[in-house]
Amino acid sequence: MVHRKATAGSDRIVGHLVLPGPLASGKAKVSVSLIDATMADQPASVVAKTEFVIENNTDNTIEFVLNAARCPTKRRWLFDATVTADEEGRLMPGDFVLTRSIVYVDPVRSADIVLDLERVT
């Protein structure tokens, strides 16, 4: 479920990461980014990023919140996400990563942002 709350010149995007199984350890670092990938001839730019630590998570769904500057419509938006046991964010076997790029035309008006992650082997 996505909730949109506009504040002075910004958008708040709430979504969920879905893991295919439990965390390998009791503690993990979560990183989620929103990337503007509109211009094919220019590098994609990170518009918003959030990082946080979860502990003793028994649920396979993790809620995330991104606070971005106002997201214009008619652009190509890409999400990037990782869940790692390493505090530095290095991927190891047993961690989770978003391997399929998911593009939205307007993420703040999308009905549902659910990102399915895959386990790193």
Each predicted region: which residue ranges?
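Solvent-exposed serine/threonine-rich low-complexity stretches and specific carbohydrate-binding patches
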Residues: S45-E55, L98-V103
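Short solvent-exposed capping/turn motifs at the termini of beta-strands
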Residues: L19-G21, D36, A85
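Short acidic/polar inter-strand loop motif in beta-rich domains
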Residues: T82-L98
